[in-house]
A protein has these predicted regions:
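Bacterial N-terminal signal peptides that target proteins for export
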Residues: 2-12
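Bacterial N-terminal signal peptides
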Residues: 10-22
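Sec/Tat signal peptide C-region and signal peptidase I cleavage site
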Residues: 23-29
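Short N-proximal segments of mature Sec-exported proteins
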Residues: 32-94
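Short, compact, well-ordered microdomains
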Residues: 93-121
Length: 121
């Protein structure tokens, strides 16, 4: 339990660093989202711990929003208990590589598509 809690805190801290750093963000003048699918893919493929944390934290947040936010009203996704953020990262990388035409989309959209393709109810 303690190991999972510490891992969660690490990912949360790294996600906060990402949000406050402003790197690889899309200008709010051009779009209403902050992270493109291509930018998220770059983070997810990185060997740097901070960027890996940004990736996994973002994916965990989107996955949580499916259940606690409005996304659950529009899509039917049932992520099995026990799926790790590392597994979510692997799913996103393979899906994003398969659909490069969506790189300029908001990252949550492409990842939600990946979740729906793998974990449809």
């Amino acid at each position: 339990m303690k190991k999972h809690y510490l891992e969660f805190l690490r990912i949360l801290l790294l996600a906060q660093i990402f949000f406050f750093s402003g790197t690889n963000l899309v200008s709010s003048e051009d779009n209403t989202y902050f992270l493109t699918s291509e930018s998220l893919l770059t983070y997810c493929q990185s060997n740097l711990p901070a960027e890996d944390g940004i990736c996994q934290g973002y994916l965990a947040g989107v996955t949580d929003s499916v259940y606690s936010g409005h996304l659950g009203d529009f899509i039917s996704i049932c992520v099995p208990k026990g799926v790790t953020t590392t597994e979510l990262k692997t799913l996103f990388i393979s899906y994003a590589i398969e659909y490069p035409e969506f790189f300029e989309r908001a990252a949550d959209g492409l990842f939600t598509d990946a979740l729906a393709s793998k974990f449809s109810c």
